[in-house]
């Protein structure tokens, strides 16, 4: 039992580490905890600043690659046992999601299409019913054991359509004026020789306002999580061994 648990936890952690291909995430003020939760198993969230800020952030020294993502939390839907996290990304600049989905899907993600996580119930006709609309699903990903299993991925051009659809059937997920320019995070891969913390300081020096932005270091989250899980598994193995001996 302990061995199987270890394998399952390690599989989940490996999936998470592959997903966290960025060294640094820049997020809006007061949203660091929400962003960290999205990287593990937290609740779906909606938060954003605007594309002009994202464009400025990308000008900092020490950045090898940068890409934007937009997060939308849906209401409970027929397709899902839990709230759905909608993740908008830019396939042209992305280096985080594409490598992770490459084994399941090849080709461009067209406007209006979705890639679904493992726990999302896709209809027999290959669609998901969300906000009163049927969205075509081009691929469904393997189980990761993380919150990504309750997520769907869309391209950034589809985000305004999603916002408009939400307004027709429920509370609008964000103001219409922001639908085409909302960015939840800038995912950054640093240049060789640059620490993520150094790049964060470079970003802050670009504009005094950027000192108030949130800075998340995904590598630290996975390292801490793996350490905690290793300790948990050790305790569980001891517990299972004691129970087994007592049973004998």
List each language-model region with its residue ranges.
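Extracytoplasmic/secreted envelope proteins and their assembly/folding machinery
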Residues: 51-54, 156, 160, 200
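Envelope-exposed proteins and targeting segments
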Residues: 20-22, 62, 82, 112, ...
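Peri-transmembrane interface segments
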Residues: 9, 13-16, 33, 196-246
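Hydrophobic, regular-secondary-structure patches
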Residues: 3-85, 205, 211-213
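Structural beta->alpha junctions
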Residues: 40, 142-144, 188-196, 219-222
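A short beta-strand structural signal in non-transmembrane regions
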Residues: 24, 172-204, 213-214
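Hydrophobic secondary-structure segments that place a key small or acidic residue at a functional site
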Residues: 69-72, 77-92, 97-171
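A short acidic, helix-capping loop that chelates divalent metal ions and anchors anionic groups
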Residues: 34-38, 145-147, 224-226
């Amino acid at each position: 039992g302990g061995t199987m648990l270890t394998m399952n936890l390690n599989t989940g952690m490996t999936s998470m580490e592959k997903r966290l291909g960025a060294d640094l995430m820049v997020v809006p003020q007061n949203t660091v905890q929400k962003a960290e939760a999205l990287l593990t198993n937290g609740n779906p969230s909606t938060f954003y600043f605007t594309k002009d800020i994202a464009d400025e952030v990308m000008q900092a020294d020490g950045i090898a690659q940068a890409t934007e993502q937009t997060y939308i939390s849906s209401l409970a839907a027929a397709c899902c046992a839990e709230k759905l996290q909608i993740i908008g990304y830019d396939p042209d600049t992305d280096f985080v999601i594409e490598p992770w989905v490459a084994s399941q899907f090849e080709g461009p993600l067209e406007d209006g299409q979705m890639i679904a996580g493992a726990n999302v119930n896709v209809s027999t006709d290959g669609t998901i019913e969300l906000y009163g609309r049927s969205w075509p699903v081009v691929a469904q990903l393997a189980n990761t054991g993380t919150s990504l299993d309750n997520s769907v991925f869309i391209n950034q051009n589809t985000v305004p359509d999603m916002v408009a659809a939400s307004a027709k059937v429920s509370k609008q997920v964000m103001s219409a004026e922001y639908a085409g320019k909302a960015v939840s995070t800038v995912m950054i891969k640093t240049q060789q020789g640059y620490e993520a913390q150094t790049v964060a300081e470079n970003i802050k020096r670009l504009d005094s306002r950027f000192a108030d932005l949130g800075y998340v270091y995904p590598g630290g989250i996975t390292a801490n999580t793996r350490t905690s899980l290793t300790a948990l598994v050790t305790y569980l193995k001891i517990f299972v061994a004691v129970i087994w001996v007592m049973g004998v």
